[in-house]
Amino acid sequence: MRVAVDGMGGDHSPSAVVEGCVQALEEFKDIEIYITGPEDLLKEAFSKFKYDKERVVFIDAKEVISTNEHPAMAVKKKKDSSLVKALRLVKDNQCEAVISAGSTGAFLTGCTLIVGRIKGVERPALAPVMPGKNGPFMIIDAGANVDSKPSYLVQFAKMGEVYFKSVMDVNNPKVGLVNIGEEEEKGNDLTKATYKLLKEEKDINFIGNVEPREVSTGDVDVLVCDGFVGNTVLKMYEGVASTILSMIKSEVKSSFLAKLGVPFLAPALMNLKKKMDYKEYGGAPFLGVKGICVKAHGSSDAKAFKNAIRQARKFHENDLIGKLSEEITKKSFDNQKNI
């Protein structure tokens, strides 16, 4: 498998990106890395490590897209940027996947404009998988589409369902609509209309509305919402997780008795920290485009980047894009028959 990597994306590029690539090359013997960025700079960063030189291809790119640039304008103008060149590798079928920890807006825009949408997809969606009390869950959309239509959300539900079936091996994923109440009549015009459409979808296991306080249980596999709500829920969840871990750490240090209990609690606390750590999950797939596109966290370190590559590899092994294309095409055909 060939993976295109934006070598200049993220807060700790290129060092963390390069180290993550080296770790991935060591762990996964069936991958090749095509890394984009200033070639001399990238080669210097790689020179600090031992790695299989036969499996790394350097693609020289002189420009970098920063987070404060207008996404669409930057993607269109900076054709020699590390991000655009990485995306073009997937567009031109030189790579099966692309990963970037750079500007989210530019990445999502570039995926749509350069890689292109799967035929029949109205809007691609950002779909991070998060740790829950009873298992992982997906938030879709988590920020790609701030303004959405009911038909978009129904398609998000279908894409999320396909993901859980093919990647997570869940036979009948539960799909819920994020709302301010469980009752069908609750919410705004968007959620009310979406609820009716999802209820009519016989091939989606729609369990109804899900209140925000129930999001983190993991009892519902796919949580559907527009990008504004999804991004808010995602950032709130990350913030609460960080706060809880910080509070536990402070309480442990607060008294002598608490410190005495640390050796007994340490394994459980370490396991909790691992479950809540975004680095373990790598990145969020951008579902609905023709290639495997993974958005890594902007502050990703080497471990997070290695896990983003692991994710992309798993998506490829499970033919996620092929299965999404098949389902969306089938759904579009069924809709045409019913017109």
UniProtKB/Swiss-Prot annotation:
> What is an example of a GO molecular function annotated in this UniProt entry?
phosphate:acyl-[acyl carrier protein] acyltransferase activity
Q: What is its EC number?
A: 2.3.1.274
- Gene3D superfamilies recorded for this chain? Isopropylmalate Dehydrogenase
Its UniProt entry gives the catalysed reaction(s) as: a fatty acyl-[ACP] + phosphate = an acyl phosphate + holo-[ACP]
Could you tell me which pathway this protein works in?
A: Lipid metabolism; phospholipid metabolism
Alphabetical list of Pfam families matching this protein? FA_synthesis
Keywords in UniProt for this one? Answer: Cytoplasm, Lipid biosynthesis, Lipid metabolism, Phospholipid biosynthesis, Phospholipid metabolism, Transferase
Q: Which GO terms describe its cellular component?
A: cytoplasm
Top-level class of the enzyme under EC nomenclature: transferase
Superkingdom of origin organism: Bacteria
| Localization (cell) | Cytoplasm
Q: Which GO terms describe its biological process?
A: fatty acid biosynthetic process; phospholipid biosynthetic process
PANTHER family registered for this protein in UniProt: FATTY ACID/PHOSPHOLIPID SYNTHESIS PROTEIN PLSX, PHOSPHATE ACYLTRANSFERASE
Its annotated function is as follows:
Catalyzes the reversible formation of acyl-phosphate (acyl-PO(4)) from acyl-[acyl-carrier-protein] (acyl-ACP). This enzyme utilizes acyl-ACP as fatty acyl donor, but not acyl-CoA.
* Similarity field: Belongs to the PlsX family.
Q: Which HAMAP family match?
A: PlsX
Q: How does it assemble?
A: Homodimer. Probably interacts with PlsY.
Record's protein name? Phosphate acyltransferase
According to its UniProt entry, this protein's organism is: Clostridium perfringens (strain ATCC 13124 / DSM 756 / JCM 1290 / NCIMB 6125 / NCTC 8237 / Type A)
